[in-house]
Amino acid sequence: MNKVFNLNTLALSFLVPSSIICAAKCDNKNANNSYLEKIASRLVIEPTELIDFKSTDPKNVISKLNVENLPLGYEISYIEIKPNGSVIYSLHKTGSDQEPQTFEYKIREDAVAIDKNTRLVYKKDSYYSSLEGLNGKTLFDELLKLQQSKIRGIKTYAYLYNVYKDAFLDKYYEKDNTILDIYSENPKGQDPYYFTYEFHEGKDADGSSGKSRSKSGEGSKYNREHIVPQSWFGKVEPTRNDAHFIFPTDKIVNNERGNYPHYIVKNPTFISRNGTKVDKTNGICEPIDEFKGDVARAYFYFVVTHNNSSSNDLFESSFPYITKKYLEVYKKWSNQDNVDAFDIDRNNAIARHYNGLRNPFSDYPELIDLIWFKTDSKFHNKGIAIAIK
């Protein structure tokens, strides 16, 4: 019994495989009610948001249930909401004297939710449970505490290359599984050059030395680009080894960028072959539009995870920890370049390598507003983002 759901009609909807749907008849007093059984077998009862059935008042659960495939002229009444996610309900024909029939519908405990506003698909998970109901500085402080409890999973500097084999593959543009380099990728046409894994600088964690193309300029090899430069935090470990903000990029462009922060460049002194701009006069670098959100979310990640930079230009020593001009531009970049499949896949791949450590802004881009822009909204845990719908 395979169901096809119209997810555009839902706010936060559970994807429930038909194999776990239980529309079992609990009371079969009248054999003439076989049609009710047929209706019940087709019903889809879904929460309109992620619900913890064990701790939520059943009355509140009922208000958050949506029913699909109920024929015109029939109605249901809820009898009981069980802590295991079972919904007991009666089904009957409207205005009929026929005795209602009782059925049970079981919702899988680890169901997946879809956020209508961002189109992110979430898997139920407790990673962010400690942030529930928080915002502002309180949310920041709790998130920093959470992230710093996870950084022990970060591995060595050489191991960054091993992470890149999983987390930074081009499955989205040329789809050729080459290394996805934000300083050379051309999202609107042919890449000026590309890197397969082995063209890295130095050795990986397996002791394998990288290769180099015999050419000058861009395209010879890639290395490890710290979005937040190492000199800003004294190269301390494990910070300098964290792939969530250290990307594989062309060595030449990396060198041209140096230790400049990313910002808006009006008068570039260098432009890479994919359009990345560097202004050495003012000491800033601007990525192409396609990756501005990725870069911005890497900076936000650094602040809520490591928060140990001594840079006096971009970072501050007290909340909000990012100077106003950068905070506003990075928010704009994140909004313009929304979380996409590259963000989601990268976040989950790195988490697998780092014993679960995640970039919260790839899971919840709204954290930028919830922490720094004083909205009335509060954080709600939907789990971890696993896909784009």
Predicted regions and their residues:
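N-terminal module-boundary/linker segments of secreted carbohydrate-active enzymes
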Residues: D110-P192, L367-K389
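Short, surface-exposed loop and linker segments with low hydrophobicity and enrichment for Pro/Ser/Thr
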Residues: Y78-N84, V163-I179, P287-R297
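Domain-level detector of nuclease and nuclease-like folds
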Residues: G210-K389
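Beta-rich interaction/scaffold domains
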Residues: M1-I114
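Short, His- and charge-rich active-site/binding loops that engage polyanionic ligands
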Residues: N186-K215, S220-K221
